[in-house]
Amino acid sequence: MTWAPVFLTLASYAAFLLLRHNAPLLHRLALSSMAVLDGMLSDSAEDDKLAALEQATSSLVGALLKFLGLVVAGGTCIATPCMFVDGLGFGLLATWQGIAAVSMGGTLAFMVPKVLPRQERPGKATSDHSPLSQLLHKMVLDHPHVHIALMRREIRAWKARGGTPNPTFLLVTGLARAGTTSMLERLVASGAFHSLNYANMPLVLAPGTWRRVHNPASSPKKERSHGDGIMVGNDSAEALEEVFFQTMASEPYVQDDAVVAHRVDAWCHETYLDYQGIALATAPHPGAMYVAKNNNALLRYPSLRKHNRDFHAVVMFREPLTHAASLRAMHQKYCAMQQDDPFVKTYMDWLAHHEFGLGQKPFKFADQTPLPQSGRNTLNHWLDLWINHYEAALAMDRHRLHFIGYERYCAQPTEVLTGLTQEVGAVVDWEAFEPYTKQRKVEGDVDPAKLEKARTLYNEMQARQRG
């Protein structure tokens, strides 16, 4: 038996290395299982549901058969050394030497080599999300009916504990790069407001359920991928509620060529307030107001306002030429990033974050909204988007709709935040924030007529600011 544990260690290493090498098969098995469950929970038409279930079941059976073959191959590897041990046979696996050998071989297989040849991506950067994290995100966010079922279960439990929806909340919106993230971070940090955060992903529709499973301590903050100096950690607030609207929408509003205006019906609005309730149930400060940064919010604002006269919305805007330049720079940055790490685009698509990058799509507020005709590397393209966005914002119901300019917010952050929280009825003793004075240098030609129109709209919004 002297050499048997050595051979068993090597055989176990080979068996578990085979398992590791076939990790994509295990991922496929997990995703196929979720697809079957998602199909069973679907409320689609019976024929569509059966067709989806048939496809998911076929994929699951195929993955199961391959997995069984993998188990047999691995078991054969481990069993082979046992056949040559006189008097013990498979009893070797029950001895301490056998258990230690299998454990050592299995551990080594997941450590050496560090990267398998098929996992290497020449010229590609390592993703911030591990393969296991990516799998978990796909299991949840690609299967909306499972996600909805978990949300409804959590809402029922919240109501059973006496939870009631509150129609007063705050939306922070505007085109990307207008200062919305900075404002959201400061509002949440005050304790008077609560928002969804990165720690809620991927089970973002059932934050209480996910927190019971995964409740990490605050992580050290690092600069976000935008490269704009804003530091984020797993407890940083972020625009995550779009998963709710994509899941609950009666018709898809992310289309091939644009993200289009859409209507929120009464049932969706009621469910949205319930969803805010379960999000607030996880807030560290009781009595906090729900706040969401959502750059898509204006696309559904008219119907939300018809259902609800109590909520407040902030529209942040910025000098049009510097705003267009900032959007163009971020678009170019994210195109390169997403080519290097495709999961970045997948993640942004889940959040309907189409403002820039390879998945960039313009907002379309009405059928007659003109889509940009200039290339995405021109300032004119982004200026067209700016005009469409803020022209629509200025035409919307003024009730509790607050316009805040980026330049004023940067120059007088404390005064702006004080005025806003007074408007929405929150009591906050704000610290004295340092003004932000950095100016962007703009390079590139622009259509003078477009710029003149944009600056006219900018002046109108400046006039709508309070204070």
Region spans (language model):
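Alpha-helical transmembrane segments and their immediate juxtamembrane interface regions
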Residues: I78-E120
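PAPS-dependent sulfotransferases, especially Golgi type II membrane carbohydrate sulfotransferases
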Residues: R121-T164, C335-G467
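A conserved segment at the C-terminal end of the G1
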Residues: T181-H194
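PAPS-dependent sulfation machinery
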Residues: A199-V291, Q360-P362
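Loop-to-transmembrane boundary segments
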Residues: D47-G74
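Membrane-interface amphipathic/juxtamembrane segments adjacent to transmembrane helices
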Residues: R20-D47
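Conserved phosphate-donor/acceptor-positioning beta-strand/loop module used by diverse small-molecule
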Residues: K293-N295, L304-A329
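Long, highly hydrophobic alpha-helical transmembrane signal-anchor segments
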Residues: M1-L17, G87-G98
